[in-house]
């Protein structure tokens, strides 16, 4: 049994469209896992039937737009039928002294006692089977969920949390800057959670980056693909080492990081039309490093005339790490990810005119054009990686 959240708030035509896309994404995920199934869509739920319900539930719990998933037992909608199934579950889990609650809901028009009375009846069944247990609706140790519908009933005692959000692919596409670090993959995941199709862009700094940097970025990209199974998730890899070579010779060192970020944004903006992307997404966080002061973020953003979305801008580092651990992109031993171009004293309030003058000194426009000519594409599908040169005019949108 699949529950979705804020889709209820949409108008009926939009809700039908979004539910259709959610079902499409569930199908792709289950097909990728090799699980056979069929589905139904009663009001407010998606029911999935299959011979491996727990495996199905585990896969569906990673689909964006799903709030939670339960392995449910189908029965009739009378108190007696619901009580027999609930009692069988209770006998497996309820012990003397344990606090429990029954969460019952009866659909209008299904007949029988209302939700509150149905909960009391089922609670009585559980107490008869385990007299030492006690009802506690506020802080239960065990819960049984009852849904009585017009055409039958469902009983379950566990809800597997899912990411929530909106179905992947309902909110257009964005180009996300993804590195080997912690923040950028979390930012991309959060955009996926809100229904946005993502194309990733990685800047390969070559000898200017730590030896584990390139592989770390690909690994982050690969792990993110496990959240959108059935979709080829693409990452454009740009050789940015010529930029660092040029900056090392002719740019005030204090502006290195700001110019680097502006370069990334300008490359992204050039690539956006071909990817049908409508925004740039970054893992930037207010005040975390020198380039992320409000002053420098403004200077960096001024390099482009497209929307720039920073999902993590207000998050503490500990909060970002917690999300990275939960979604599987946190690496306990990341290896050497150092940037060898970071100056000892980077500017925290870059002067825009001076930055533009420095860019002109090294002909950033030419560097951008040359970088785009050397793009490689890394495609991740269900956690499997393929690397190839980008064919001319190839679309890299995942949806």
Give the residues covered by each predicted segment:
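RNA-binding accessory domains that recognize and position tRNA/RNA substrates
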Residues: 1-175, 185-233, 349-352, 378-399
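Active-site adenylate/phosphate-handling loop in enzymes that bind or generate adenylated species
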Residues: 121-126, 159-171, 232, 241-327, ...
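General small-molecule cofactor/ligand-binding pocket signal
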Residues: 136, 236-238, 309
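Cofactor-binding loop segments of dinucleotide-utilizing enzymes, especially the Rossmann-like FAD-
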Residues: 179, 203-205, 240
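A conserved beta-strand->alpha-helix junction
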Residues: 221-249, 335-340
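A short alpha-helix-loop-beta-strand transition element characteristic
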Residues: 328-336
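The feature marks non-catalytic terminal segments
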Residues: 335-339, 343-399
